[in-house]
Every structure is written in C-alpha cells, then in structure tokens.
Amino acid sequence: VLGQMVLLLLPACAAGLITGFLLSSVHIQLVAGGGFLVTLALGSVNLLRTWNQAGQPGSAATDHLMIALCLLLIMTCIGMAVGINVLWTPPVMPYGTLHLVAYTHTAFLGFFLQATVAGLSYALPALLAAQRVTSHKKRVAYQDTLAQIANRWRALQVSTLSFGTLGLVLVASLTWNLPLSSNWIQAGTWGSLGLLL
C-alpha cells in the first residue's frame, strides 16, 4: 500500500514543482517540494523495508539506487532551503544565478548518474545473457556469472562515482571565489571527470 501511494504521489508532487517553476511561484514550489520530500522519505523507507524483508544480498545496482535516492533527498532539501531563502528580504544567504544553476545541476547530475548506473548494473547482465545464450538453462548460469562480474568491484564503482559527483560539487563551490580559468577549478573538474569515468 505504501509503495502504491508513493508511486501516485511522486508524479503529482513533480507536476506541482513544474507548475511552480512555470508560474515562478515560490510558495507553490515549497508546498510541492515539501510533499516531494515526504514522499521520497516514505519511498526510501518502503524500499529499505522491502529490501530487508527479501533477504537478498546487496548488489552494485542496489547500492547505486540507494545513493541516487540520497542525492535526490539532499537535492530536494537544498531546493527547499533556496526557496525559503528567496522569500526573506534581504536573503539570508546571497548567491548568484550561476551558483544556483551549478548546485542544482550538479545534484541532478549525481542523481541521474547513480540511477543510470543502477539500471545498467541490474539490466545489462540479463540483456546480454538473453542476446548471447539461446538455451534457458545455460542463460541463467551465464546471467549469474555476468552479475558476479558486475558486482566484483562494487565498492570501488560506488565510491568513484560518488566522489566524482562530490568533486563537481566542490568545483561548483570554488566558483564563488575563483575565476573559471583558475588552475584549481580546472584540476578539480578534470579530476572529478576522471573519477566519473
């Protein structure tokens, strides 16, 4: 029941956020963002509960999915804080448009990358096994072997993708004080992209 409620509320809250953005109404954005935050928290609790009750060991896909959910929760909290900041006159934390764009896009990039890698880690072994092996009995064994290969370095996969995303957040925060042509920003950008690869 909780899972169905989450699946119904997430699109409704996302539609509310989009409506708030289109109407440039911070109040609508905050209400929809609050609903989105509560729905995400309920979805995370439901996912963790289902995962624990299933008794299955974790995999790279589940690790990436949990980090993607954490990034989405953090991004929603930051978005609500920015909305509350905008309502105050003068704003408690003055920031430029470039900084706001950098933070929101970096958080979204982290969520998108983690969710994409989670989907690939889950679906790729099954797709490759279905394409390469015609016998059903051999396909299951081949798929298990591919899943083991995908999970072999799962801690390294998750950590490099996470640190690459955090590195981009650091680069975004460095733009407050340094020009874009700075060696620090260029080194941070290339180092983060190297971790993401």
For each of these PLM feature ranges, what is it?
Residues 1-197:
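Hydrophobic alpha-helical transmembrane segments of multi-pass integral membrane proteins
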